[in-house]
């Protein structure tokens, strides 16, 4: 899980979702998980 100021999808399978007011990237690849913070 990476905490970044600006998040962007890394690959085609990355999806941007909003959960509890936080923007996240979820992906099949665990290395691509990101949260904005």
Swiss-Prot record:
Pfam families, per the entry: Ribosomal_L36
Superkingdom in the source lineage: Bacteria
UniProt GO molecular function: structural constituent of ribosome
GO annotations of cellular component type: cytoplasm; ribonucleoprotein complex; ribosome
InterPro entries in the cross-refs: Ribosomal_bL36, Ribosomal_bL36_sp
Keywords: Ribonucleoprotein, Ribosomal protein
Example of a GO biological process term: translation
PROSITE patterns: RIBOSOMAL_L36
Similarity comment text for this entry: Belongs to the bacterial ribosomal protein bL36 family.
Protein name: Large ribosomal subunit protein bL36
Species this chain originates from: Fusobacterium nucleatum subsp. nucleatum (strain ATCC 25586 / DSM 15643 / BCRC 10681 / CIP 101130 / JCM 8532 / KCTC 2640 / LMG 13131 / VPI 4355)
Higher taxonomy: Bacteria, Fusobacteriati, Fusobacteriota, Fusobacteriia, Fusobacteriales
Gene: rpmJ
